[in-house]
């Protein structure tokens, strides 16, 4: 029998005990929650808004449907899904991190998004929802922080309705070599400095860069989704593969 206390995983470039990673990731997001939206705009030059818009366009979400915005953070996708599903639909904004969930709730209420949105603190590896609950699940820039990604994908598959779809928006591997080198230089030298100046937290943004490099590439993630049960899995490279959107269905 394997001693679970001896099982390891990665936290950025570090090797840590599996049972420690969730707490370490939680510390990162507790630290950056208050500056999360500002940093997203600065780090991506605002392009993250286009990536998320494309995700919405590919979701096929319609009025009356039920959507899970997993690792939904400050609620960018939830705000848009709320309008799409209307009064007869529902969006669940779920995040494992209490600080991020609080920021999302406050932000959405301040812009008048109420009524058809619920907030749930949840671990992607063990989603607290019945089987066949959601028409669509999105996880945006969250999967790379999950300790057991395969377990999380199986959990998402379980709570999707037949005919439902999962969309994973995540940093990936640039497909143009010169861009890859420039991206590395930006990630490891510029991002931590921005984090230090704006959020007073260089370490969290160093972890961000490292976690991106440790995340599975496009084809590996596609295979992982297929292994979890998803069918008709495909992906779109955005900004030359800096980010990829994967989509899979439960039939």
From Swiss-Prot:
Known catalytic reactions: a 2-demethylmenaquinol + S-adenosyl-L-methionine = a menaquinol + S-adenosyl-L-homocysteine + H(+); a 2-methoxy-6-(all-trans-polyprenyl)benzene-1,4-diol + S-adenosyl-L-methionine = a 5-methoxy-2-methyl-3-(all-trans-polyprenyl)benzene-1,4-diol + S-adenosyl-L-homocysteine + H(+)
One Pfam family here: Ubie_methyltran
Claim: Cell membrane is one of the keywords in the record: no
Residues where S-adenosyl-L-methionine binds: 74, 95, 123-124, 140
Function statement: Methyltransferase required for the conversion of demethylmenaquinol (DMKH2) to menaquinol (MKH2) and the conversion of 2-polyprenyl-6-methoxy-1,4-benzoquinol (DDMQH2) to 2-polyprenyl-3-methyl-6-methoxy-1,4-benzoquinol (DMQH2).
PANTHER family listed in its UniProt record: 2-METHOXY-6-POLYPRENYL-1,4-BENZOQUINOL METHYLASE, MITOCHONDRIAL (PTHR43591:SF24), METHYLTRANSFERASE (PTHR43591)
Protein name in the entry: Ubiquinone/menaquinone biosynthesis C-methyltransferase UbiE
Biological classification of the source: Bacteria, Pseudomonadati, Pseudomonadota, Gammaproteobacteria, Enterobacterales
Gene name in the database record: ubiE
């Amino acid at each position: 029998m394997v001693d679970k206390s001896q099982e390891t995983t990665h936290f950025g470039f570090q090797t840590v005990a599996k049972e420690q990673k969730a707490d370490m990731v939680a510390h990162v997001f507790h630290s950056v929650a208050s500056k999360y939206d500002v940093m997203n705009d600065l780090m991506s030059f605002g392009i993250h808004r286009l990536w998320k818009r494309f995700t919405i366009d590919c979701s096929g979400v319609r009025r009356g449907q039920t959507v899970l915005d997993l690792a939904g953070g400050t609620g960018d996708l939830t705000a848009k899904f709320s309008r799409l599903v209307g009064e007869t639909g529902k969006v669940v904004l779920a995040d494992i991190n209490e600080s991020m969930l609080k920021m999302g709730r406050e932000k959405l209420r301040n812009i008048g998004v109420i009524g058809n949105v619920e907030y749930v603190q949840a671990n992607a590896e063990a989603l607290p929802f019945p089987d066949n609950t959601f028409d669509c699940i999105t996880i945006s820039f969250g999967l790379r922080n999950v300790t057991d990604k395969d377990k999380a994908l199986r959990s998402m598959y379980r709570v999707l309705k037949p005919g439902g779809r999962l969309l994973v928006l995540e940093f990936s591997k640039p497909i143009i070599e010169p861009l890859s080198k420039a991206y590395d230089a930006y990630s490891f030298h510029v991002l931590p400095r921005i984090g230090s100046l704006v959020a007073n937290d260089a370490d969290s943004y160093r972890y961000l860069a490292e976690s991106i490099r440790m995340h599975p590439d496009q084809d590996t993630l596609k295979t992982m989704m297929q292994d979890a049960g998803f069918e008709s899995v495909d992906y779109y490279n955005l900004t030359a593969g800096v980010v990829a959107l994967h989509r899979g269905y439960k039939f």
